[in-house]
């Protein structure tokens, strides 16, 4: 343990902001007068470099101006925080997890963000809301590139508060360019809104009190890479590890601390775990970060999947023999919430070949879900109760299995899903 403490201490990078003295803000220099002026910007996607897909601009939901407030209930029109500053929402790009982002899509959103920020100047602060696991063609640190380019527009004195997913990646450049930085403390991310509010609360608090940039930041890269399926904070060891973060922020001289698991499904130098802390007391900040990093390293071999892992045949046998219903089987090899294509048909093809599901007296199974635009269009045309015969899946990733043909009866048609837009349920076999 003593040897590991030495290693982690050597890895700790103290990033000094103002070298312990409060830096001059735009308000100090007379550039800004009146209420606090805080901009909002950010691009967020979790994108796997191992997926054959690419995410274009059409894959993003881009909001601008006052429409952005809808994503932040703590900034609603009647919220206390809304009255504490003039909020200037610029551009917010969001996409469901997917493949690497095209350079054209990234540049289009970035350039528009920069223009909108320039028009919003002068500023006291920026709420920088990102995921942290965006991959872009030709870049190995997109979020670091984005914040560096933003700095070229807003300058070094504007206070930047960054909010991230705990499965994001924190490069040294992103850590340096962010004055305040925080992440979710729960997986599943039940505290997403709470974490974003913490980012804005810390930002407003420092601006209102005239504290400026924190004097010290500690950034510790931890050489661990874990998949999300092993990092639920509802079970150990992540439960106890993340339970330590909150108390760390109550220490004198520590404003906030965070642990990033990192993102396993992109082949980039920044993909690893990170621990950070920041505040105005150098010793307290360093100690908080090192204690969290040491705990993380100590339990690194204890992370495990949240459920037993096995082959499809074994899982199906267990499901059919189980008295507990429904029995849920997760195909985590094609996880669309982590950047997988979500249309690999291998598992569905295996299920369609099993005779027990053809028997009218046999078991039933719900497969959720597989993309199939042609099937959806046909289902809408024939309506509920109609017969469909169309292919689905393997439009993005056909490396393991081709598209499957589904012949069956339309059981339901649902409109309005935020990602899929239209969903249909087709009964096949028994």
PLM regions with names:
Residues 31-34, 82, 115-124, 315-327:
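Glycine-rich phosphate/diphosphate-binding loops that line cofactor/substrate pockets in enzymes
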Residues 207-238:
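Internal, active-site/partner-interface "lid" segment
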Residues 39, 43-46, 50-52, 103-110, ...:
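Active-site histidine-anchored catalytic micro-motif
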Residues 30-82:
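N-terminal amphipathic/basic leader segments beginning at the initiator methionine
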Residues 36, 226-430:
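Hard-cation-handling environments
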Residues 20-22:
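Bacterial signal peptide processing site
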Residues 2-10:
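Sec-dependent signal peptide recognition
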Residues 16-18:
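C-terminal motif of bacterial Sec signal peptides marking the signal peptidase cleavage site
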